């Protein structure tokens, strides 16, 4: 069994970028900054250029190939959409590959030398000033963290990110509903180190954990609350679902009890053969957050429908490559149900008992009969085959139902837990 010190020593190697990666990142960053500087000069845009995010604070993970560059507008009369239009024209003229992305407002994502560089316009604000767009806070976030995090703590941020990535809770997008990069940095800044974050998290309780860097009376309804030091009316942990928070609590407890390098390795556990049904849809041409949000809602409604039909669902989830398909996966007790089911009625002394009995008098059922104090019938199921049940609910459409072919994460042994 490895000691905590041995595991951390090995894990630190996994989260430290090579000198070559550092040089390449800096080279691409400077290249795009120069292009943006030329563009804002050409079009007379009053702005400052800032590199923010993990690449600017040395909290990025090896292999990460994305950079965030902000155009901080100093003139609020400038429309962000106009800036995007001018920049897209500029990059097109110079043969730079770009695509339009959307958050609260549009921004550009460039592909430069194998790196994805997000170019995000925002307005310049001061501490205590209300943001005009969500992106306006980013320069202030950067300033706060640069002042708070030591070099050792930045290394611990990288460790925490890989830990969270391994257990599946890293990322604030709807796909994950987990911890954002900014949130991981705040946790290390607040508690002091990677181990101290885990020790604290092992004592967290959902809906009773409130973290703030200064006195705050703001109220939030969320499993975890971390008040933004830049905007006291904002919960940085708003995206963290109950499941993600609870997964992190469990992983923290288990790692501290039995440290292992498995918490920092992207591995797959063995497939456990069980009954599983998968509904596969073609991937729509829409932003990922829209797609994940929609199919999570559809997935929940299908889960409820399967329960109504008598199929016991052990667990379910949504998976996608965000290119060609999106799937709803259900791990179930049975694919085929027996033709008859026991249906419980009201107690014999309840006023509703007469209506229940009369409903089934002329039906092809066993009963009505009394068991204990209740009336029951044994009646024929509407659906015995899970595919028929799904087709009725989903109707005609462009989807495929696959039975017992899925071998993804939902039917695998947990590879990291110790």
Swiss-Prot record:
CDD domains: NT_2-5OAS_ClassI-CCAase. Its cofactor is Mg(2+). The keyword Isomerase does not apply. The keyword Nucleotide-binding applies. It comes from the Archaea. Keywords: ATP-binding, Magnesium, Metal-binding, Nucleotide-binding, Nucleotidyltransferase, RNA repair, RNA-binding, Transferase, tRNA processing. A single active site specifically recognizes both ATP and CTP and is responsible for their addition. This is CCA-adding enzyme. It comes from Pyrobaculum islandicum (strain DSM 4184 / JCM 9189 / GEO3). The gene is cca.
């Amino acid at each position: 069994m490895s000691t905590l010190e041995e595991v951390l020593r090995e894990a630190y190697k996994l989260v430290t970028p090579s000198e070559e990666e550092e040089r390449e990142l800096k080279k691409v960053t400077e290249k795009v900054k120069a292009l943006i500087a030329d563009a804002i000069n050409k079009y007379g845009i009053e702005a400052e250029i800032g590199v923010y995010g993990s690449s600017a604070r040395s909290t990025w993970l090896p292999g990460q190939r994305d950079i965030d560059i902000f155009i901080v507008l100093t003139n609020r009369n400038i429309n962000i959409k106009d800036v995007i239009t001018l920049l897209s024209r500029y990059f097109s003229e110079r043969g730079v590959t770009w695509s339009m992305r959307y958050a609260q407002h549009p921004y550009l994502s460039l592909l430069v030398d194998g790196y994805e560089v997000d170019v995000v316009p925002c307005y310049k604000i001061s501490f205590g000033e209300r943001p005009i767009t969500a992106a306006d806070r980013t320069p202030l976030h950067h300033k706060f963290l640069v002042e708070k995090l030591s070099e050792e703590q930045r290394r611990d941020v990288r460790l925490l990110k890989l830990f969270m990535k391994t257990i599946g809770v890293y990322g604030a997008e709807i796909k994950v509903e987990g911890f954002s990069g900014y949130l991981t940095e705040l946790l290390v800044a607040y508690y002091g180190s990677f181990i101290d974050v885990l020790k604290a998290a092992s004592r967290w309780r959902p809906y009773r954990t409130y973290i703030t860097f200064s006195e705050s009376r703001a109220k939030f309804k969320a499993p975890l609350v971390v008040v933004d030091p830049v905007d006291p009316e904002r919960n940085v942990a708003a995206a963290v679902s109950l499941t993600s928070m609870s997964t992190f609590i469990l992983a923290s407890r288990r790692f501290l009890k039995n440290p292992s390098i498995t918490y920092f390795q992207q591995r797959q556990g063995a497939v456990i053969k069980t009954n599983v049904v998968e509904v596969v849809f073609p991937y729509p041409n829409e932003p990922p957050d829209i797609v994940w949000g929609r199919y999570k809602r559809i997935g929940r409604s299908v889960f409820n429908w399967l329960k109504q039909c008598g199929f016991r669902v052990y667990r379910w989830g949504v998976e996608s490559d965000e290119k060609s398909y999106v799937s709803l996966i259900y791990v179930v007790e049975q694919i085929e149900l027996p033709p008859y089911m026991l249906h419980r009625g009201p107690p014999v002394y309840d006023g509703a008992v007469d209506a229940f009995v009369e409903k089934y008098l002329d039906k092809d059922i066993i009963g009505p009969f009394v068991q204990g104090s209740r009336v029951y019938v044994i009646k024929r199921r509407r659906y015995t085959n899970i595919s028929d049940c799904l087709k009725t609910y989903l109707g005609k459409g462009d989807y495929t139902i696959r039975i017992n072919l899925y071998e993804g994460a939902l039917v695998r042994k947990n590879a990291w837990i110790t």
